[in-house]
Amino acid sequence: MTNRGYGVLVNHPQCVSFEVGSEKVSKVQFSVESEYLEYFVIDGPTPKAVLDRYTRFTGRPALPPAWSFGLWLTTSFTTNYDEATVNSFIDGMAERNLPLHVFHFDCFWMKAFQWCDFEWDPLTFPDPEGMIRRLKAKGLKICVWINPYIGQKSPVFKELQEKGYLLKRPDGSLWQWDKWQPGLAIYDFTNPDACKWYADKLKGLVAMGVDCFKTDFGERIPTDVQWFDGSDPQKMHNHYAYIYNELVWNVLKDTVGEEEAVLFARSASVGAQKFPVHWGGDCYANYESMAESLRGGLSMGLSAF
């Protein structure tokens, strides 16, 4: 949006280069590597009117459930926790008279470096169904962490590879890297069967009592790949975040209803505001990070989130 009463949407899902006051201090320029350039000029005349017209075009977020506006508590990146640890966190909040609405299990509810195969670690959580029942009896909603990757260490990795559910290189070999976990591969959500497999795992967790999902990652999608449906790898780099969050959102909408559906999402692209809510990325518990989060929230709000 500009101070002259209009907004601009560059309608390209691939990388877009913006020059903001660099070549000419009074101008913003944008470009894409393509044979054409498509963009929309959205009239105002006020910022509110621009945003209203933009969301008519790209979609509007559903109103999140009332409980999602309460306080969330997370294990964060605690690497060694069990039900007793979880209860110590929750009881500590009660002792301090801090009302709690949601408890979130981050990545180590699953076995380390098998992310994401949706199986509770039986050594630390031998009775996940019972634990969830006990936590919900305290009036809590339950959120669990997921991502769109699968570690080579997972027992289901070979099955997923053989069925073609994972992203491939142009030569047909499996695309992998080691930057998050050894031998990481990416679910190919352009494959309908891969989507069904992933969605069924989520539905199993919902049936267990899970209320929402932290859809972590979804960015840094490689471009030296071959998608199941033949999609352009350059365009999928950003669009992947949309189809990933859409898949998880639809599972919740179909199981608990749109009025109760909510995500705890990290990545996004144009239109992903339809799948609320998003968080501003990892931050520290200090005043500097609080300021960063406030600035991020203001920016996201003006981007329709």
PLM features per residue range, with description:
Residues 2-305:
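Catalytic-domain carbohydrate-binding cleft regions of carbohydrate-active enzymes
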